[in-house]
């Protein structure tokens, strides 16, 4: 049976202005992971997002038919509404962005993370420490946490999020940051260790120009809303959910 993906639980974030927007081929996740994003709270309506191609039409006299082709692509205008939160840092940033001509990075985080996967593991005391988890299926950069009935080796702390590096079919090491250096373990350990993935939902990144920051009114029983329309000015990068069972 088909799976529905509700909008409920999604969040929208805005970053600081940029001077240049990369070409489509250069839109990669690392451009955005270093950005300090601020959530725009009170999101009431999510606008459309994604490419649409322009239509090229030429009327051919001899055939009596129009020929059509796809032209340039446009990621559209995202027409968002927010309940008014005057002291919200994200709404303040959105309103300030409308007053400029700059492009801003945006992040959409959806609430569709898969269930976490858990397994007992063994950990070597070595440089780097190696975690053994048979057929773990984890990828580099995937997030995991550890728990134990005893003591983890020095270098690892229970409940802290680590990131997979150097994965093989049945083993991997971890780093303190995505793509960081593998952690060396030392000392002694005891008990049974458990690794649990830290799943993330779908994330979309893009650059956009904030075109409006208007207040919408209505009748007496209508709440005032902040209308924040964003002209998407780049390709939209979609990062699929990771870290689930």
What is the predicted function of each stretch?
Residues 13-25, 107-111, 145-149, 163, ...:
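Predominantly extracellular/luminal cell-surface or secreted proteins
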Residues 1, 10, 22-37, 91, ...:
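Charged, amphipathic alpha-helical segments and their flanking helix caps
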Residues 2-84, 202-203, 207-224:
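Solvent-exposed edge beta-strands and adjacent loop segments
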Residues 116-203:
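Small/polar beta-strand repeat architecture
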Residues 63-113:
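Structured, beta-strand-rich domain cores
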Residues 32-36, 52-71, 87-92, 121-136, ...:
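Surface-exposed ligand/attachment interfaces on beta-rich extracellular proteins
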Residues 109-116, 198-239:
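Short beta-strand and beta-hairpin "edge-sheet" elements
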Residues 83-85, 109-111, 145-150, 209-213:
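Generic short beta-strand segments
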């Amino acid at each position: 049976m088909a799976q529905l993906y509700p909008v409920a639980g999604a969040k929208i974030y805005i970053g600081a202005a940029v001077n240049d927007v990369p070409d489509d081929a250069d839109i990669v996740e690392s451009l955005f992971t270093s950005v300090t994003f601020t959530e725009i709270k009170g999101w009431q309506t999510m606008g459309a997002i994604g490419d649409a191609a322009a239509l090229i039409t030429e009327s051919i006299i001899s055939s009596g038919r129009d020929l059509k082709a796809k032209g340039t692509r446009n990621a559209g205008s995202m027409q968002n509404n927010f309940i008014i939160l005057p002291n919200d840092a994200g709404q303040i940033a959105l309103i300030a962005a409308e007053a400029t001509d700059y492009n801003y990075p945006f992040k959409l985080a959806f609430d569709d993370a898969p269930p976490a996967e858990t397994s007992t593991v063994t950990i070597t005391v070595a440089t780097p420490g190696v975690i053994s988890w048979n057929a773990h299926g984890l990828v580099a950069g995937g997030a995991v946490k550890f728990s134990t009935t005893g003591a983890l080796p020095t270098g690892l702390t229970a409940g802290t999020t680590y990131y997979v590096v150097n994965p093989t079919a049945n083993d991997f090491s971890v780093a303190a940051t995505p793509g960081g250096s593998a952690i060396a373990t030392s000392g002694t350990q005891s008990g049974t260790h458990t690794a649990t993935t830290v799943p993330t939902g779908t994330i979309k990144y893009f650059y956009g120009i904030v075109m409006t920051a208007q207040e919408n009114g209505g009748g007496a029983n209508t709440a005032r809303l902040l209308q924040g329309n964003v002209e998407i000015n780049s390709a939209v990068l979609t990062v699929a959910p990771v870290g689930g069972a």
